[in-house]
Regions:
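Conserved glycine-rich Rossmann-like NAD(P)H-binding loop of the short-chain dehydrogenase/reductase
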Residues: 32-47
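Active-site loop immediately N-terminal to the catalytic Tyr-X3-Lys motif
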Residues: 100, 149-153
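Conserved glycine-rich cofactor-binding loop
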Residues: 14-17
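Residue(s) in the substrate-gating loop at a strand-loop-helix junction
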Residues: 142
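C-terminal helical subdomain
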Residues: 182, 198-234
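Active-site helix of classical SDR
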Residues: 122, 158
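Substrate-binding pocket helix/loop in short-chain dehydrogenase/reductase
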Residues: 98-111
Length: 260
């Protein structure tokens, strides 16, 4: 359980790259047990090895977050090994280029992973943590969730759903001493951003993003949105009426697809 106020048993999805990888390495330490999942077996094992070098005991599993039964089995077994203090629902995929090019199949896949996968990750831990009267759940959304983006309509919709879900769950579970936090990053170096050909303002290294996230979770910050200039701009864009936001949205570059 929690040692000196720090999580000692942590489960992270999407840990084979990007923010998930950086968070796993940031939390890795002696007396910390990590349960990691990802899509890429080779990269996931590399991350697990780095975390073990930092002194952590690591259990790594290649699991599809959209497979509810498999997720329940994995999470239940992990919690049985060492009751989870912190669960980070990080796994997600990006969208296509928008402008009518996202097929229904692509949009459904994005929703299944980014929303369904989050639900499959947090459902069982929320119930168990509520029973124990302690724990923390972090949902990774995005600054893209502040407004529907024509360049990535399904992606922005999925992240808006995650953002709203976390915001709604937070006061409900606060009465049971379970903290719920929402993470809204801007551009963070990852395999997805590596494939983008357009300028990405304030692109941030994953380890720096992990440091910000870890600090925010430690302070139980409701929404951890960064970098702050982009967070403010995203909030403002979301608050604008449609006619005022339209010219800005039309100039936004398309996202590169990542629907594997």
């Amino acid at each position: 359980m929690v040692l000196s106020g720090k999580p000692a048993s942590i489960l992270i999805t999407g840990a084979s790259s990007g923010i998930g990888e950086a968070l796993a390495c940031a939390y890795a330490a002696p007396d910390v047990r990590l349960f990691l999942s990802g899509r890429d077996p080779e990269r996931l094992e590399q991350v697990a090895s780095r975390c073990r070098e930092s002194g952590s005991m690591v259990d790594a599993a290649v699991i599809d977050v959209t497979d509810r039964e498999a997720m329940d089995r994995w999470i239940s077994a992990s919690d049985d090994v060492r009751p989870l203090d912190l669960v980070i629902a990080n796994a997600g995929i990006s969208g296509g280029s928008g402008s009518g090019t996202e097929t229904t199949a692509i949009m459904r896949r994005i929703m299944d992973v980014n929303v369904g996968g989050v639900l499959n990750t947090i459902d069982l831990p929320l119930r168990r943590m509520a029973e124990r009267g302690q724990g923390q759940i972090a949902l990774v959304a995005s600054l893209a969730g502040y407004r529907g983006l024509p360049s990535a309509p399904a992606y922005s919709a999925s992240k808006a759903a995650v953002r709203a879900l976390g915001g709604g769950l937070r006061p409900v579970y606060a009465t049971r001493n379970v903290r719920v936090n929402v993470i809204c990053p801007g551009f963070v170096v990852s395999r997805i951003t590596d494939s983008n050909s357009f300028p990405m303002p304030m692109l941030m290294p994953a380890d720096k993003a992990a440091k910000i996230i870890r600090s925010g979770l430690g302070r139980n910050q409701a929404t951890i949105a960064f970098p702050w200039p982009m967070a403010f701009s995203s909030w403002l864009l979301g608050a604008l009426p449609g006619w005022a936001a339209a010219p800005v949205l039309r100039r936004m570059p398309a996202k590169s697809p990542d629907c594997g």
